[in-house]
Regions:
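Terminal amphipathic alpha-helical/low-complexity segments used for targeting or macromolecular assembly
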Residues: 1-105
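Structural signal for interior beta-strand "rungs" in well-ordered beta-sheet cores
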Residues: 100-123
Length: 123
């Protein structure tokens, strides 16, 4: 079954989706989040001068909030209570070289959710 079909089928019953969701759905959501993170897919893109929203990708993001529990996150300057699955991972564990390769500056204590693609600014 395609990722799009898995997500669209789950969306029809979104009120019943919880952290106990079946693994196929979790895998589909996590794959889309990973694809967003890498830039392989986008929730919306401009095609022939028209902005097209990819509904199944938007739905996958929303469903991800239903399959992960709230968590307490502690940082050096603050703590947060949020759906941590997207806050963990974008730059967690990055080295100086990883940051330089990514090409963006990130001020201390600024979380960047995992599903966000950050690209170099071109001037």
């Amino acid at each position: 079954m395609s990722l799009e079909k898995i997500i669209n089928d789950a969306w029809e019953n979104k009120d019943q989706i919880s952290p106990n969701a079946d693994q196929e759905l979790k895998d589909a959501i996590n794959q889309i989040i990973a694809d967003l993170d890498s830039g392989a897919v986008r929730a919306a893109e401009k095609i022939n001068d028209q902005w097209i929203a990819h509904q199944h990708i938007k739905k996958a993001i929303m469903l991800s909030f239903r399959i992960y529990p709230m968590e307490n996150l502690n940082g050096p300057y603050s703590s947060w209570y949020d759906k941590a699955h997207l806050l963990k991972g974008k730059t967690a564990g990055w080295t100086k070289e990883d940051h330089e390769k990514a090409g963006f500056r990130m001020v201390p204590n600024s979380p960047v959710r995992k599903d966000h693609l950050l690209e170099r600014m071109r001037f």
